[in-house]
Regions:
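N-terminal helical capping/dimerization or prosegment-like subdomains
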Residues: 1-103
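Conserved active-site and cofactor/substrate-binding residues in soluble primary-metabolism enzymes
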Residues: 11, 15, 41, 45, ...
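Generic secondary-structure signature for well-ordered alpha-helical cores
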Residues: 25, 55, 144, 175-176, ...
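Active-site metal-coordination/substrate-binding segment of hydrolases
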Residues: 86-156
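Active-site-proximal alpha-helical scaffold in enzymes
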Residues: 129-145, 164-172, 230-242
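Histidine/acidic-residue-rich, glycine-tolerant segments that coordinate divalent metal ions
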Residues: 149-230
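Acidic-enriched catalytic cores of C-N bond-cleaving enzymes acting on peptides and small amides
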Residues: 177, 192, 201, 222-277
Length: 277
């Protein structure tokens, strides 16, 4: 394990950090924030940079390509042949970036990578540029240690910050090559601090609903209609209360799940960890 740690530390300084720094220098914004994303070549440049870096890491059985269809965003698609296992692992990340807000601290800028106190500052480094570098390095270490792994598929999209408009399309169109994953890792979550590797077990979901309430066939003056015609907002509030009680904050049973005891135990351990910190 000591030698493995030394190897990873060396790779980080010699290859990963320089690769991430070069990635930061590319101002490839998510399509929602760049109307010329399909013609200015920035997304293509960033995607090819990631692919070229990955192919240089010596991972056995790796095939990589930048998938692009007209009118759709770019997708870094990497396949790694199985070695001693018939399982399939799907890993996800994204390489598009949110728009910068200028120089938010002295000496720091969006496309100017700066290492300060052992931390890399630059737009898109942690959200979510690190993903491919972490994935490939992990697989490289497994192979160097003689470990076995199943078929590995890596998908790094370029539209996450714009709502992932093409992710489902690409997953379907490439399903024949992806197969049926036995496990999936999403390399795009948060962390409590930078002293450990954090694993997110679950996130709260969201349901988007478009609701239109009509009470009258034609408009009436509020001075004569109020109190007689039902108020549309009141009707909407009643409807929402059927799902989420505004008085008790309880949601309807079909939308609620029981929290497993082991997750409650995890939360308590996390609270103890934060208290110690």
């Amino acid at each position: 394990h000591e030698q493995t740690l030394k190897d990873v530390q060396k790779d980080f300084q010699d290859s990963i950090l320089p690769g991430l720094e070069d990635f930061v220098r590319i101002d490839n914004l998510s399509p929602e924030f760049d109307p010329e994303w399909e013609t200015n070549g920035k997304a293509e440049k960033a995607g090819n940079h990631l692919i070229n870096w990955a192919l240089k890491q010596g991972v056995k059985g790796m095939k990589a390509e930048l998938v692009k269809e007209k009118g759709r965003t770019h997708l870094v698609f990497i396949e790694i042949d199985a070695n001693g296992s018939n399982k399939t692992v799907l890993l996800y990340g994204h390489f598009d970036k949110q728009p910068p807000l200028g120089e938010w601290d002295e000496g720091l800028a969006p496309t100017k990578p700066v290492v300060k106190d052992g931390k890399l500052y630059g737009r898109g480094a942690s959200d979510d540029g690190y993903a491919l570098f972490a994935i490939v390095e992990s697989i490289k270490v497994i192979q160097l240690q003689g470990g076995k792994h199943g078929k590995i598929v890596i998908t790094i999209e370029s539209g996450e910050e714009s709502g992932s408009p093409d992710l489902v399309y690409y997953l379907k169109s490439l399903s024949g090559r992806i197969g049926t994953p036995d496990v999936m890792f999403c390399m795009d979550s948060g962390c409590i601090d930078y002293s450990a590797v954090w694993l997110t077990t679950s996130l709260r979901g969201v349901v988007n609903v478009e609701c239109e309430v009509e009470c009258l066939k034609e408009s009436v003056h509020s001075g004569s209609g109020s109190g007689i015609a039902p108020d549309s907002f009141t009707v909407l509030r009643i409807l929402l209360d059927r799902l989420d009680d505004s008085k008790t904050s309880k949601i309807v049973a079909p939308l609620s799940v029981d929290i497993p005891d082991y997750r409650v135990a995890d939360a308590k351990k996390l609270a103890e960890y934060q208290k110690e910190k």
